[in-house]
């Protein structure tokens, strides 16, 4: 099978065609983002900006992946696992966004409801992988390759839930999570291409195409936000791709900004609960730099560069 940019082009085209219509629909319905009180005060001017844009690039990515792989006669169980992970986490985010919009508040699903949904999707992925005779083995530093279905399943559960939330935490500035996700998915597209894993190539290129189309409307000043529907889907998709390329640990470098954003929140909570003091002015850490006086564009560019450096380092050493 030959490499093709058709998945990228298809997803990009679908997104740039339908996203303006979606933005117009949301504005007509007066449905927009409710900005949380705990965030930077200058973010309040973003209140009312249409959200849930992730639904558009998510569907564009799924449609493009499916029709291209059907056309190439390469549809297999891995395809469906990727789609289920991407759509499954996206649906959880969609429900979360929908509740926020319906009740005009910044809180959607309760934490336990969202976590339960994420665990169910992860469990489904594990079950499908098991039925597909996927190699349940995990490399553990200093211990080597460990073949243990239970340990591997726990890891997959943690990885999917953890990174879906990590991307979600990073979606706090115009274009930030979109740019970081483009870099991460492009890195995995290259790895999959090198390994001739055409299913993952098609999926990652479709997601990249959707994200590039979405970025046109999401960069500062954003005309639309991706919402939890987009960020949870992107995180779940990244985690699943890393696992099915048998390179799960790669996400620690390729998704280094997502990791740092999450660590900043964890450290802040631990510090405040144990000492009563905060390490950062505000978390996730992109808000800390805003509080230091950095513009959104400066934070975006610096964080994108860090993400790009992480990906390049991984490719140089292990690619």
Curated annotation (Swiss-Prot):
<feature type="transmembrane region" description="Helical">
    <location>
        <begin position="116"/>
        <end position="136"/>
    </location>
</feature>
<dbReference type="InterPro" id="IPR003524">
    <property type="entry name" value="PNAcMuramoyl-5peptid_Trfase"/>
</dbReference>
<dbReference type="GO" id="GO:0046872">
    <property type="term" value="F:metal ion binding"/>
</dbReference>
<feature type="transmembrane region" description="Helical">
    <location>
        <begin position="149"/>
        <end position="169"/>
    </location>
</feature>
<comment type="pathway">
    <text>Cell wall biogenesis; peptidoglycan biosynthesis.</text>
</comment>
<keyword id="KW-0131">Cell cycle</keyword>
<dbReference type="InterPro" id="IPR000715">
    <property type="entry name" value="Glycosyl_transferase_4"/>
</dbReference>
<keyword id="KW-0472">Membrane</keyword>
<feature type="transmembrane region" description="Helical">
    <location>
        <begin position="224"/>
        <end position="244"/>
    </location>
</feature>
<keyword id="KW-0808">Transferase</keyword>
<feature type="transmembrane region" description="Helical">
    <location>
        <begin position="51"/>
        <end position="71"/>
    </location>
</feature>
<dbReference type="GO" id="GO:0009252">
    <property type="term" value="P:peptidoglycan biosynthetic process"/>
</dbReference>
<feature type="transmembrane region" description="Helical">
    <location>
        <begin position="79"/>
        <end position="99"/>
    </location>
</feature>
<dbReference type="Pfam" id="PF00953">
    <property type="entry name" value="Glycos_transf_4"/>
</dbReference>
<comment type="similarity">
    <text>Belongs to the glycosyltransferase 4 family. MraY subfamily.</text>
</comment>
<feature type="transmembrane region" description="Helical">
    <location>
        <begin position="197"/>
        <end position="217"/>
    </location>
</feature>
<protein>
    <recommendedName>
        <fullName>Phospho-N-acetylmuramoyl-pentapeptide-transferase</fullName>
        <ecNumber>2.7.8.13</ecNumber>
    </recommendedName>
</protein>
<feature type="transmembrane region" description="Helical">
    <location>
        <begin position="252"/>
        <end position="272"/>
    </location>
</feature>
<dbReference type="GO" id="GO:0071555">
    <property type="term" value="P:cell wall organization"/>
</dbReference>
<comment type="function">
    <text>Catalyzes the initial step of the lipid cycle reactions in the biosynthesis of the cell wall peptidoglycan: transfers peptidoglycan precursor phospho-MurNAc-pentapeptide from UDP-MurNAc-pentapeptide onto the lipid carrier undecaprenyl phosphate, yielding undecaprenyl-pyrophosphoryl-MurNAc-pentapeptide, known as lipid I.</text>
</comment>
<keyword id="KW-0133">Cell shape</keyword>
<feature type="transmembrane region" description="Helical">
    <location>
        <begin position="172"/>
        <end position="192"/>
    </location>
</feature>
<keyword id="KW-1003">Cell membrane</keyword>
<dbReference type="GO" id="GO:0008360">
    <property type="term" value="P:regulation of cell shape"/>
</dbReference>
<feature type="transmembrane region" description="Helical">
    <location>
        <begin position="299"/>
        <end position="319"/>
    </location>
</feature>
<keyword id="KW-0573">Peptidoglycan synthesis</keyword>
<dbReference type="Pfam" id="PF10555">
    <property type="entry name" value="MraY_sig1"/>
</dbReference>
<dbReference type="InterPro" id="IPR018480">
    <property type="entry name" value="PNAcMuramoyl-5peptid_Trfase_CS"/>
</dbReference>
<feature type="transmembrane region" description="Helical">
    <location>
        <begin position="5"/>
        <end position="25"/>
    </location>
</feature>
<keyword id="KW-0479">Metal-binding</keyword>
<dbReference type="GO" id="GO:0008963">
    <property type="term" value="F:phospho-N-acetylmuramoyl-pentapeptide-transferase activity"/>
</dbReference>
<dbReference type="GO" id="GO:0051301">
    <property type="term" value="P:cell division"/>
</dbReference>
<keyword id="KW-0132">Cell division</keyword>
<keyword id="KW-1133">Transmembrane helix</keyword>
<dbReference type="GO" id="GO:0005886">
    <property type="term" value="C:plasma membrane"/>
</dbReference>
<keyword id="KW-0961">Cell wall biogenesis/degradation</keyword>
<keyword id="KW-0460">Magnesium</keyword>
<keyword id="KW-0812">Transmembrane</keyword>
């Amino acid at each position: 099978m030959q490499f093709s940019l058709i998945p990228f082009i298809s997803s990009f085209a679908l997104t740039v065609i339908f996203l303006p219509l979606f933005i117009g629909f949301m504005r007509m319905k007066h449905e927009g983002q409710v900005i949380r009180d705990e965030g930077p005060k200058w973010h309040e001017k973003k209140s009312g900006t249409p959200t849930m844009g992730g639904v558009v690039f998510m569907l564009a990515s799924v449609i493009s992946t499916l029709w291209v792989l059907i056309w190439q006669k390469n549809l297999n169980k891995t395809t469906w696992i990727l789609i289920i992970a991407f759509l499954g986490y996206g649906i959880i985010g969609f429900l979360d966004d929908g509740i926020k919009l319906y009740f005009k508040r910044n809180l959607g699903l309760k934490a336990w409801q969202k976590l339960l949904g994420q665990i169910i999707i992860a469990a489904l992925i594990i079950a499908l992988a098991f039925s597909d005779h996927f190699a349940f083995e995990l490399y553990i530093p200093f211990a080597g390759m460990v073949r243990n279905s239970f340990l591997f399943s726990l890891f997959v559960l943690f990885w999917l839930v953890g990174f879906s939330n990590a991307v979600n935490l990073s979606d706090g500035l115009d274009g930030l999570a979109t740019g970081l996700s483009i870099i991460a998915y492009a890195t995995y597209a290259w790895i999959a291409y090198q390994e001739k894993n055409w299913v993952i190539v098609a999926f990652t290129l479709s997601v990249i195409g959707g994200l590039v189309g979405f970025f046109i409307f999401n960069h500062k000043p954003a005309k639309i936000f991706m919402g939890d529907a987009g960020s949870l889907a992107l995180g779940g998709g990244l985690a699943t791709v890393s696992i099915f390329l048998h390179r799960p640990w790669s996400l620690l470098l390729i998704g280094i900004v997502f990791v740092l954003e999450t660590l900043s929140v964890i450290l802040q909570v631990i510090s405040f609960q144990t000492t009563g003091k905060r390490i950062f002015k505000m978390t996730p850490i992109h808000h800390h730099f805003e509080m230091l006086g950095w513009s959104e564009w400066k934070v975006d560019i610096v964080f994108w560069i860090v993400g790009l450096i992480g990906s390049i380092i991984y490719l140089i050493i292990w690619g």
